């Protein structure tokens, strides 16, 4: 089993449990150059809010889009957008990525901005 398939296996297991709970999910996807965050409805078929370093408004504020500062900016942006739509409680779906570095920075920034998970 290679690194990617192991991560996907971990992510699938976590998503199955979150689906049983019927929770709104804050999903994170990470690449070496960018980080993406989406708030997905409990049914799993609707993206309620999204933010990423690909967006011009966020990328202009940053020197580089693949570091912890960029992840924190995305976390803050997605939390503010979720609160505008009335979403306060979410479950954090790290997509099989280790809770460390950029993933942790995004989660901490989202918590500081008012999301609860």
Curated annotation (Swiss-Prot):
The keyword RNA-binding applies. InterPro entries: Ribosomal_uL18_bac-type (IPR004389), Ribosomal_uL18_bac/euk (IPR005484). Gene3D superfamilies: 3.30.420.100. One of its GO terms (molecular function) is 5S rRNA binding. Residues 1-17 are annotated as: Required for binding of the 5S rRNA/L5/L18 complex to the 23S rRNA. Keywords: Phosphoprotein, Ribonucleoprotein, Ribosomal protein, RNA-binding, rRNA-binding. It comes from the Bacteria. The basic N-terminus is not necessary for binding to 5S rRNA. It is however required for cooperative binding of L5 and L18 to 5S rRNA as well as for binding of the 5S rRNA/L5/L18 complex to the 23S rRNA. Part of the 50S ribosomal subunit; part of the 5S rRNA/L5/L18/L25 subcomplex. Contacts the 5S and 23S rRNAs. This is Large ribosomal subunit protein uL18.
